[in-house]
């Protein structure tokens, strides 16, 4: 009995092992494309599909109210996506959320520069009122404001 696999089977096995590691959770912002990012919305269905995605549902129901300029929009049958918007509400990019954990989504939103308030009704610092999302190098330059 031979343990050697044909090349096609080896390729399929390798692809199956690598695919989970390269899922949508590896999103990296392209700051050139996201120039002018000021707000975002999470588009998702409100029912059965969201109920299957416990991590995404927890983010939508519990975390979104804490973020400034991040809202939720119910769309029947929609897969959960983070829609990044510019100053005039023009769509800059869509990021699928289905494969991400609650922790990964929160990390992404914070990496994009959205301000997380201490409480849903808390005041927002002046530097985050009009343009909550900035590249990391810009936020570090203005940390003293």
Curated annotation (Swiss-Prot):
Its main location: cytoplasm. Keywords: Cytoplasm, Endoplasmic reticulum, Golgi apparatus, Selenocysteine, Signal. May function as a thiol-disulfide oxidoreductase that participates in disulfide bond formation. SUPFAM superfamilies: Thioredoxin-like. It holds the Pfam family Sep15_SelM. It is found in: Cytoplasm, Perinuclear region; Endoplasmic reticulum; Golgi apparatus. There is a cross-link at residues 45-48 (Cysteinyl-selenocysteine (Cys-Sec)). This is Selenoprotein M. One of its GO terms (molecular function) is oxidoreductase activity. Widely expressed. Residues 1-23 form the signal peptide. The active site is at 45 (nucleophile), 48 (nucleophile). It comes from Homo sapiens. Belongs to the selenoprotein M/F family. It comes from the Eukaryota. InterPro entries: Sep15/SelM_sf, Sep15_SelM, Sep15_SelM_dom, Thioredoxin-like_sf. The keyword Thylakoid does not apply. One of its GO terms (cellular component) is perinuclear region of cytoplasm. GO terms for biological process: adipose tissue development; corticosterone secretion; hormone metabolic process; multicellular organism growth; response to selenium ion. The gene is SELENOM.
